[in-house]
């Protein structure tokens, strides 16, 4: 498991980041949010569709997006495009999760991907690596 006390390289303080999780399966979404809150110093907000995600970014500026590919109303690629077209969010790293992912589309957009079922340690390592790069 990642070190719960991820420290800022400058002054040793803990850098708390915000993560927007977009997952329509409530069991998986709650699992991801709980894993983030229990195993990292970061905060996660769960929404269940693309429209809720677009509304959420009017109130928060996440440091990481975690998107399911198969969402109601729009797929994860369409949501990624809308989120990253928003001023100030163009360079926010993104993890796309699904049992079936369109690899070519992910590569064109430099989206990180994980297949379902998720391996928790792999998920937490990727979250830590992406957020650590933004410290």
How should these model regions be labeled?
Residues 49, 75-81:
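Acidic catalytic/metal-coordinating carboxylates
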């Amino acid at each position: 498991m990642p070190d719960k006390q991820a420290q800022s390289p400058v002054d040793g303080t803990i850098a708390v980041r915000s993560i927007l999780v977009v997952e329509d399966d409530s069991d998986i979404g709650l699992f991801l949010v709980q894993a983030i809150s229990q195993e990292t110093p970061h905060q996660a907000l769960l929404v269940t569709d693309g429209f809720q995600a677009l509304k959420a970014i009017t109130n928060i500026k996440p440091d990481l997006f975690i998107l399911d590919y198969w969402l109601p109303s729009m797929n994860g690629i369409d949501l990624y495009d809308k989120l990253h077209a928003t001023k100030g969010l163009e360079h926010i790293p993104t993890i796309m999760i699904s049992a079936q992912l369109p690899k070519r589309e992910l590569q064109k957009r430099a989206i990180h991907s994980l297949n379902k079922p998720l391996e928790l340690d792999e998920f937490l390592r990727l979250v830590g690596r992406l957020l650590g790069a933004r410290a």
